C-alpha cells in the first residue's frame, strides 16, 4: 500500500492581457472585463466537488502548498485572492508552514497591490520577467519593459513577502552569449531569493511555431548554459532542478512536491491534478480548458487511473529533474511497487553511468543529465 505523499493545490486563472507568441499554456487574452467574482465562485465549487469526489484520498490531509498560476493571476484584485484563500481554508486545512505562491506579470502590479496580496495571505510571488532587454521583451510579446520589471522587483522586496522568484529565459531570438549573461547579471544584482532560468523552446500551436524565429544553435546554447550556470553558482544560487536556482532555504516547496511525485489537487480552467488513494490507486485528472464551459459549471474534463506499469516512468520523469538523490524508499512508498520492478532498468542505467546508487538512494550523474531522455526511456513500457 503506498504511503500518501504531501498534498498541494494548483489554482489556474486563465486570463492575461495578451497572448505571448511562445506561450502554450491555457491562457486567454482579455477581450473585455474579466468575470472575476463569477470565476472565484466556480473555483470554490470546483474544489468542493473534488473534495467530495476524491474524499477517500483527501481524508484528514492538510495542504502543503498552494500555487496560483495562469495566465496572469495578478489581474485579480487582492480582495478576490483574500476571499478565495479564506474560503479554501474553510474547506480544507493548511499545514502550519504552508507556502502560498501567486504568479505576477511586472506590467500588472503596483505597490499597493503587492502589499494587498501579502495581506491576503500570499507569501511568495513568481514574476515573469523573461529578459531585461527591451528589444527581446518586445520580440517575446511581453507588455512590460526592463524598467518596469526592476521596479516590480524592488516593490516585492519591501512588500513583506517571505520570498519571490524571477522567471528568466535564455536562447531567445538572435540572442548572443553576452546578452544572455547580461540578463542574468541584472537579475543577480536585484538579489531575488529564487531564479527560474528556462531555455526558450518552440511549442506546437504557438505563434512562434507558425513563424519560427532564428534561435541560437546548440553550441551557442551550451555556452550560454555553462557560463550562466557558473555566474549563478558564484552568486550563491544553488541549482536544485533542471531550470531552478535558489539561495539556501528558498527552494520552491510547491514545485518540489511536483518533482518528488507528490499529490496535488487542481482547480480552474485546464488545471491538471494527481492523487494517491489508500487502496494503492493513483489518479490523474484535468479540468475543462475553456472559460465558457468552466463558467457553466462543467469542471471535470478527464479522469484516469495510472496503471502500475506506467508508474516507474512517471516517478523517474519527475524525480530525475531534481539534482538531489532519489530515496529508494520513496519509490516504494509513492508508487506502491517494490524496487525489484525496476531492477533491470536500474542496473543498465548504472552500467551506462547515467546514475549511481548506494544502499538508500539513486543519484543522477552529470553524464545522466546530458542523456536524460535516454535514461527515462529505460522506464517506458512497450505498447
Swiss-Prot record:
Its cofactor is [4Fe-4S] cluster. Its main location: cytoplasm. GO terms for molecular function: 4 iron, 4 sulfur cluster binding; coproporphyrinogen oxidase activity; metal ion binding. Residues 1-241 form the Radical SAM core domain. It comes from the Bacteria. SUPFAM superfamilies: Radical SAM enzymes. One of its GO terms (cellular component) is cytoplasm. Belongs to the anaerobic coproporphyrinogen-III oxidase family. HemW subfamily. Might carry two S-adenosyl-L-methionine binding sites with only one binding to the iron-sulfur cluster. Probably acts as a heme chaperone, transferring heme to an unknown acceptor. Binds one molecule of heme per monomer, possibly covalently. Binds 1 [4Fe-4S] cluster. The cluster is coordinated with 3 cysteines and an exchangeable S-adenosyl-L-methionine. This is Heme chaperone HemW. It comes from Haemophilus influenzae (strain ATCC 51907 / DSM 11121 / KW20 / Rd).
Amino acid at each position: 500500500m503506498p504511503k500518501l505523499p504531501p498534498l498541494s493545490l494548483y489554482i489556474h486563472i486563465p486570463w492575461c492581457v495578451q497572448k505571448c507568441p511562445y506561450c502554450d499554456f491555457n491562457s486567454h487574452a482579455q477581450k473585455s472585463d474579466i468575470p472575476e467574482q463569477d470565476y472565484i465562485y466556480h473555483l470554490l465549487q470546483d474544489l468542493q466537488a473534488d473534495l467530495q469526489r476524491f474524499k477517500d484520498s483527501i481524508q484528514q490531509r492538510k495542504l502543503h502548498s498552494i500555487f496560483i498560476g495562469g495566465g496572469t493571476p495578478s489581474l485579480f484584485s487582492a480582495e478576490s485572492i483574500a476571499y478565495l484563500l479564506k474560503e479554501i481554508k474553510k474547506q480544507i486545512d493548511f499545514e502550519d508552514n504552508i507556502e502560498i505562491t501567486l504568479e505576477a506579470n511586472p506590467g500588472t502590479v503596483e505597490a499597493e497591490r503587492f502589499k494587498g496580496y501579502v495581506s491576503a495571505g500570499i507569501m511568495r510571488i513568481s514574476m515573469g520577467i523573461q529578459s531585461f532587454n527591451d528589444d527581446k521583451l518586445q520580440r517575446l510579446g511581453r507588455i512590460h519593459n526592463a524598467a518596469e520589471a526592476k521596479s516590480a522587483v524592488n516593490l516585492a522586496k519591501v512588500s513583506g513577502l517571505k520570498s519571490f522568484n524571477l522567471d528568466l529565459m535564455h536562447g531567445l531570438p538572435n540572442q548572443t552569449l553576452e546578452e544572455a549573461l547580461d540578463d542574468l547579471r541584472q537579475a543577480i544584482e536585484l538579489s531575488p531569493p529564487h531564479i527560474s532560468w528556462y531555455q526558450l523552446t518552440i511549442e506546437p500551436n504557438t505563434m512562434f511555431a507558425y513563424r519560427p524565429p532564428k534561435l541560437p544553435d546548440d553550441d551557442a546554447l551550451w555556452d550560454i548554459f555553462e557560463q550562466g550556470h557558473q555566474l549563478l553558482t558564484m552568486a550563491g544560487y544553488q541549482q536544485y532542478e533542471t531550470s531552478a536556482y535558489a539561495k539556501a532555504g528558498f527552494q520552491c516547496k510547491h514545485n518540489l512536491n511536483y518533482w518528488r511525485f507528490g499529490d496535488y489537487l487542481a482547480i480552474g480552467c485546464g488545471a491538471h491534478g494527481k492523487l494517491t488513494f489508500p487502496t494503492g490507486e493513483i489518479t490523474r485528472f484535468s479540468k475543462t480548458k475553456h472559460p465558457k464551459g468552466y463558467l457553466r459549471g462543467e469542471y471535470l474534463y478527464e479522469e484516469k487511473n495510472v496503471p502500475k506499469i506506467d508508474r516507474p516512468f512517471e516517478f523517474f520523469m519527475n524525480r530525475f529533474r531534481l539534482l538531489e538523490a532519489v530515496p529508494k524508499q520513496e519509490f516504494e512508498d509513492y508508487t506502491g511497487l517494490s524496487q525489484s520492478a525496476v531492477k533491470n532498468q536500474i542496473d543498465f542505467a548504472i552500467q551506462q553511468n547515467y546514475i549511481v546508487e548506494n544502499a538508500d538512494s539513486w543519484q543522477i550523474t552529470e553524464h545522466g543529465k546530458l542523456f536524460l531522455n535516454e535514461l527515462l526511456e529505460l522506464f517506458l513500457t512497450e505498447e
